[in-house]
Regions:
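Primarily the internal scaffold of c-type cytochrome electron-transfer domains
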Residues: 7-75, 81-87, 93-95, 103, ...
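An exposed acidic His-Trp-rich patch
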Residues: 122-125
Length: 388
């Protein structure tokens, strides 16, 4: 694709999609493998290299200590996970990951000890890459599970999230593009199987939803046109996943919260805020929201009741004096309207339901109070009295 689509390729290169998965080598591995150690729940694990291989000595099947080779990386920032091959074509996800934000090893939650016979233990089904993770980190992923032998022969076209993940199979498009320009037939969508432009907002959002949603899958994604529900079953707004007002509780991957929002109902789509190839925000700070919302009305102290960056004021500090939020943070739209939660340790995920803070309701139903996320020295009564 790069031969013709240079700009799109350059934007994609180095993105979270590009770095979704890779073969472990000196370029792709971020973690410290210079005899680094971490002790969790009385078990000391060691990361090291030998004969060019990345190895970890830790507790494995049945809790027995052993040496395991790491063959693949998974993700990049703010954390990187690592995959270990097991018999039956399985790749298993280590419970120890690299915090690429603070450069340290840590244990991926849950923080409490997990027994070797628990479904969540890292050598068991919950941490199996083939069945739980692979479909959204590689392109044209075919699990190829054999129920008779309880084994996998998993394949992919691209190890990461590549062009065909969104655009669909591209061979016919390449054949069309390689014809002399005057000899190209008039074909639908340049002979690409899946349409990515000229869509309505629902169709556009559902291009992203297969991976950016909490859902079950009824088969492998063939990256071809069709309704989201042809293959996927998005999770409902259940009490184990969302707070009673719809705020995110568990890791739900955006779609379920965004489709609750007024933004979604008014045809806002993912690409209004995210550049589709780099996945970066199209603008920084409040400028992102001011693409649609009038700055004279909303980017003002009269609206958000906070000091702007550069104005005199006192930052919010912790009990031991650490600065938690500098002056001006409260003037950012996302602080009040997209409060988030941390998942998998250091991974902060903003809530995409775009709510108006309601401290009284939050106190009544036990949902997070957007004000108290920053104002850690205050209480719910203060929040309710402060909302005008």
């Amino acid at each position: 694709c790069e031969d013709c689509h240079n700009l799109e390729y350059d934007n994609w290169q180095g993105s979270h999609h590009d770095l979704a998965m890779d073969v472990a080598n000196d370029t792709t591995v971020l973690g410290d493998f210079e005899d680094a150690e971490i002790t969790v729940h009385g078990v000391t694990s060691r990361f090291y290299k030998k004969d060019g291989k990345f190895l970890v000595y830790t507790n494995g099947v049945g809790g027995e200590m052993g040496e395991f080779e790491i063959t693949h990386t998974f993700g990049w920032y703010p954390l990187q996970q690592y995959l270990v091959p097991f018999p039956g074509g399985r790749l298993q996800t280590l419970p120890l990951a690299w915090d690429s934000k603070d450069n340290k090893w840590f244990r991926v939650p849950p923080d409490e000890p997990v027994e070797p016979d628990d479904w969540l233990y890292w050598t068991n089904a919950a941490q199996n890459w083939n069945g739980m993770c692979a479909q959204c980190h590689s392109t044209n992923l075919q699990k190829n599970y054999d129920i008779e032998t309880d084994s996998y022969n998993t394949t992919w076209s691209d190890i990461d999230v590549g062009c065909e993940s969104c655009h669909g199979p591209g061979s016919r498009h390449v054949e069309w593009a390689e014809m002399p320009e005057m000899g190209r037939p008039a074909v639908w969508n340049f002979d690409l199987v899946r349409k990515t432009s000229g869509l309505d907002s629902r169709e556009h959002v559902e291009l992203c939803a297969p991976c950016h949603s909490r859902r079950g899958a009824m088969g492998d994604d063939n990256h071809r046109p069709g309704d989201l529900l042809d293959i996927y079953l998005p999770s409902l707004l259940s009490e184990d996943l969302y707070f009673a007002d719809g705020q995110i509780l568990e890791e739900v991957y955006v779609y379920g919260s965004f489709t609750q929002s007024k933004m979604y109902r008014h045809d806002v789509r993912c690409s209004d805020c995210h550049e589709v190839h780099s996945i970066e925000l199209v603008k920084e700070g409040n400028e992102l929201c001011l693409q649609c919302h009038r700055g004279a009305q909303y980017d003002t102290t009269q609206h958000h009741f906070h000091k702007q960056e550069g104005e005199e004021g006192e930052p919010i500090v912790s009990a031991d004096g650490e600065v938690l939020f500098k002056v001006g943070t409260g003037a950012e739209c996302v602080q009040c309207h997209m409060p988030g939660r941390y998942y998998m340790g250091p991974d902060y995920r903003p809530d995409h339901s775009f709510r108006i803070p309601d401290p009284a309701l939050d106190a009544e139903i036990g949902a997070p109070d957007a004000c108290l996320r920053c104002h850690v020295d205050k209480d719910a009564q203060w929040s309710q009295e402060s909302i005008v």
